[in-house]
Design a protein with these regions (language model features):
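An acidic-aromatic loop/edge-strand motif
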Residues: 50, 80, 143-225, 281, ...
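Accessory beta-strand-rich segments of carbohydrate-active enzymes
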Residues: 26, 30-31, 50, 87-203, ...
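Substrate-binding/catalytic cleft of secreted carbohydrate-active enzymes
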Residues: 302, 358-362, 370-586, 602-612
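Beta-strand-rich binding/interaction modules
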Residues: 122, 222-263, 272, 619-644, ...
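Accessory carbohydrate-binding/adhesion or oligomerization-edge regions at the termini
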Residues: 19-77, 157, 161-166, 182-184, ...
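Beta-strand-rich ligand-recognition modules
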Residues: 122-171, 261, 265-269, 273-283, ...
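Substrate-binding clefts and catalytic carboxylate motifs of secreted carbohydrate-active enzymes
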Residues: 36-56, 114, 179-182, 189, ...
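Active-site-adjacent substrate/metal-binding segments within catalytic domains
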Residues: 71-98, 102-111, 115-123, 128-131, ...
Length: 874
């Protein structure tokens, strides 16, 4: 577990303050607001494949599975790259009743995201089509004539097949990520009054719709706040209402309250602008991500008709060219972080909100201050979490190495850009928009129009800037920030521009084989993981060997994930696909200042020994620390050395510490074999600041495998009983003293009792799960009933001297929002039956492109050409 080295004084506040709020269609629900929200995730009938008449009300779907969304069309093994995932049509059908408390409300369904193309039918009638897998869409129910108490049938056809007509457009077999299918994000049922705040995407107005908050004249003494609220009257009569805006602090205590009357004719919309000042504002920053709460209410007299909460952070971000990046009136230093794909072991893109939050926390734990969401807008829950964690975000429009000359394609790209800005514009975490297509040779007029749109959609001071690759037409001379490399700043001819590396850390032999010392599967063990950590440290160091004009970079990529165009998963993560940390995580973590006090992330002094003391371990011992120096003692202090942690100007904050010629297995054997004193074989690293020991890490060689041990990877966030949430439980093979047996080779069988289900089975190598580097993870999904869950683990083939079984208990908590569903989920979805491993080969290959070796070489050479052209060979 990565938390072992953290000081207790830092860890306790982390666990106490780890709070997650999830927005619904742009708003956090506000009690007593008049807006009703239901969780619409449970109770969907699912069928993978096309089937005639599946939209009809009388269609017999009783043989279909009942599942909850977020949902993937097919559970896959943890290593399933190379277009092994299903691509094609999949159907979802939901039988439901409009709740009675929706009487008098305008009822709609808000889909946060479903992959590819979607066609929606209500009660057998086709009502909508949506193109694209990364942005939300809304289905109006009341407009279709349904009323509270009505029994309804919603059918959704999804299709994640390759489609060149809408972004990203690229065929998956030439794509560096995967189009995992399904309704893979949340679905909400929302009831609003006839006079209500509009949805920014539905309103479809430039820099308008919904609630739009921006700030001006920001300092530590004062900030001007502007809140634009669009209200619509869908009724048949003229209404006069009050738009009330309350700025509250993080504890919901009002700081400022303003109200303004507005008269609306039937069918009319109006935007109300409210301006006020905040004295002595608490400014948002990565180290202190303070969030105010804008409470918006629409009132008719004392009755609240509609409302919601928008969380905002007051901060001033400036890119000053050769003077670098400034935050809140001060030089910030380097922005160093990572890219992020929304990919998780087994479930593909179908992460619940809790795992979105945990991912953001893991990235901030690792010392990241900026995340590039590559290559598409991410789940709203991830954006909410970035606000909480103090993670700056570069939001990218969907696209990767593909350009369609049909003018409609460019229009759809620009449409996506407008929608992503309207969705994410209030997040203080958003620092840059990336409105162009990644690594794509698009025409100059496209780049200029994309830039114009970002400025048109956010026309106020302090707006997020636009970033794009310096090699692309129309970018170098026009964009606010250009993507480049360390050293580009030395020859830059535009002093007003800042330079940022969009993807650092890649060192492939070529873009066909992808052999790379920065990519190491956790299963490969100690030596590859150490090489990866040191190689990434070198790349990290390059982000600091620059002038002020170079403002930072994002590592590619912090989480292992599946890809389309290569048979190997991407193994360059500092975490694996289950979010188990590698040595590289500690290399990144050690770059955070020891003095950092963060309200959520792990922080404070740390020291970590990247060495397993095995018979095959190196003689040199590498230690990662953010202290002044490290004292390494071996054999109960028989030998001891102290080395400084180098903090050189123009280099990474804390260089790895390498103790030469420390470990010798034969020397250790003298204690354990000849002296019968194996307890003396240990290493202790002590982090020292100002002459005092502030943190300690101890290693011992693992001895005989005797037992299993489990822990729950909560990150301080409990499992929610909503039928969609899941959590990772990890079983470790240990010796008598609890040292993890990294070289153990076992298969672990998991069972569960109570209100939990195991995701996956033997067909995807999920259960039993092979031990890798000492551990085997399992995914536990909640039911909709809160309660205790007991997880048990034992080795697949038990025996007298086999490791002893173990168990662990956790408890799920109630969901905050009510559910709307009529059918209970079948166990098969959690177990994986029918979802993974079941399709015969002919079904799995149906619809897939089968290439000759010559054809495959040709398309892969084109990918290689584009990646080389855009400079990613560095």
């Amino acid at each position: 577990m990565k938390k072992l080295f953290i000081l207790l004084v830092c860890l306790l506040p982390v666990l106490a303050q780890a709070q997650m709020e999830t927005s619904v269609a742009g708003f956090i629900p506000l009690s007593g607001s008049g807006r009703i929200v239901y969780n619409f995730n449970p109770g969907w009938r699912f069928h993978r494949g096309d089937i005639k008449g599946a939209e009809a009300v009388r269609f017999d779907d009783t043989s279909w599975q009942v599942v909850s969304v977020p949902h993937t069309v097919e559970l896959m093994p943890a290593e399933a790259s190379g277009c092994r995932n299903y691509q094609g049509v999949a159907w979802y059908r939901k039988h439901f009743v409009i709740p009675q408390d929706m009487k008098g409300k305008e009822v709609s369904l808000h889909f946060e995201g479903a992959m590819g193309k979607q066609v929606i039918y209500l009660n057998g009638k086709r009502v909508q089509e949506h193109l694209g897998g990364y942005l939300p869409f809304t289905v109006q129910l009341t407009e279709q004539g349904v009323q509270p108490g009505d029994s309804c049938l919603l059918a959704v056809m999804t299709d994640n097949s390759d489609d060149k007509n809408f972004p990203p457009g690229k065929r998956q077999y030439t794509l560096d990520f995967a189009y995992h299918g399904g309704i893979y994000r949340d679905v909400w049922m929302i009831g609003k009054s006839s006079v209500a705040i509009t949805d920014a995407l539905e309103a479809d107005k430039v820099a308008g719709g919904g609630v739009f908050v921006h700030f001006d004249n920001i300092s530590g003494k004062k900030a001007e706040v502007y809140v634009d609220t669009e209200v619509h009257n869908s009724g048949k009569q003229t209404r006069t209402v009050a738009v009330e805006t309350v700025l509250a602090d993080a504890g919901d205590v009002p700081v400022k309250r303003v109200s303004q009357q507005v008269k609306l004719q039937a069918g009319e919309s109006k935007t109300v602008r409210q301006r006020f000042a905040v004295r002595n504002p608490k400014l948002w920053s990565p180290d202190s991500p303070y969030l105010y709460r804008i409470q918006s209410r629409v009132k008719a007299g004392h009755e609240v008709l509609d409302g919601g909460v928008t969380r905002v952070g007051i901060r001033k971000a400036e890119f000053k060219g050769k003077d670098g990046f400034w935050l809140n009136g001060k030089p910030f230093g380097q922005l160093v972080g990572a890219n992020r794909h929304q990919d998780f072991a087994y479930v593909g893109n179908a992460l619940p909100n809790s795992q979105q939050w945990r991912d953001a926390k893991r990235l901030r734990d690792a010392g990241c201050t900026i995340i590039r969401v590559a290559h598409y807008p991410q789940d709203p829950a991830f954006m909410d979490a970035c606000d909480e964690m103090g993670l700056f975000v570069i939001v990218a429009t969907p696209g990767w190495q593909y350009w369609n000359k049909n003018p409609e394609f460019a229009k759809l790209v620009h449409r996506n850009t407008r929608e992503m800005i309207r969705r994410d514009r209030n997040h203080p975490s958003v620092l840059m928009w990336e409105p162009i297509l990644n690594e794509t040779p698009y025409p100059r007029d496209f780049a200029l129009e994309a830039l114009r749109i970002t400025r048109e959609e956010f026309p106020y001071p302090g707006r997020p800037v636009a970033a794009a690759d310096v090699h692309s037409k129309g970018v170098a001379e026009n964009y606010d920030v250009v993507y480049g490399w360390p050293g580009d700043d030395e020859k830059a001819d535009r002093p007003e521009q800042c330079i940022f590396t969009r993807e650092f850390g890649e060192n492939v032999d070529d873009w066909y084989a992808h052999n790379n010392n920065n990519r190491a599967s956790r299963s490969w063990g100690e030596r590859p993981l150490l090489v990866q950590a040191l190689s990434l440290s070198k790349s990290y160091d390059e982000m600091y060997r620059t002038t002020g004009q170079f403002v930072g970079g994002a590592q590619w990529h912090p989480f292992d994930h599946q890809r389309g165009y290569h048979p190997d998963p991407y193994f360059g993560g500092i975490y694996d696909a289950f979010r188990q940390p590698k040595y590289a995580y500690y290399a990144f973590r050690s770059q955070s200042a020891a003095t950092l006090k963060h309200p959520v992330a792990e922080c404070g002094p740390m020291v970590f020994i990247a060495h397993e003391m095995s018979p095959f371990s190196d003689a040199d011992v590498v230690v990662f620390s953010n202290c002044d120096s490290v004292r390494l003692s071996v054999y109960d202090g028989t030998e001891s050395r102290t080395l400084p942690v180098v903090h050189a100007q123009g280099h990474m904050p804390n260089a790895p510490v390498i103790f030469k010629d420390v470990w010798d297995f034969w020397e250790a054997r003298e204690y354990s074999y000849k002296q019968k004193n194996w307890q003396k074989v240990n290493m202790v690293a002590k982090g020292i600041i100002d002459g005092k020991v502030v943190c300690t890490y101890k290693r011992m060689p693992s001895r005989r495998s005797t037992k299993l041990r489990m822990y729950v990877d909560t990150e301080g966030k409990q499992l929610v009983a909503d039928g969609s949430d899941f959590i990772v439980v990890v079983a470790e093979v240990t010796d008598d003293s609890g040292n993890v047996r990294r070289l153990a080779k076992e298969n672990i069988v998991f069972t569960v009792e109570g209100e939990g289900r195991i995701i996956g089975d033997a067909s995807i190598n999920a259960n039993p799960r092979t031990v890798e580097f000492g551990s085997a993870p399992v995914l536990i999904r909640s039911t909709r009933k809160p309660g205790k869950i007991k997880v048990k683990a034992h080795v697949q083939f038990e025996g007298t001297n086999a490791p002893v079984a173990t168990e662990i208990e956790l408890e799920s908590i109630p969901s905050e929002l009510p559910f709307c569903y009529t059918e209970e989920e079948t166990d098969a979805q959690s177990a994986g039956a029918g979802l993974a491993g079941s399709p015969v080969r002919t079904e799995r290959m149906a619809g897939k492109v089968v290439l000759t070796e010559e054809e495959r070489q040709k398309v892969l050479m084109e990918v290689e050409r584009q990646q080389t052209e855009f400079g990613t060979e560095k």
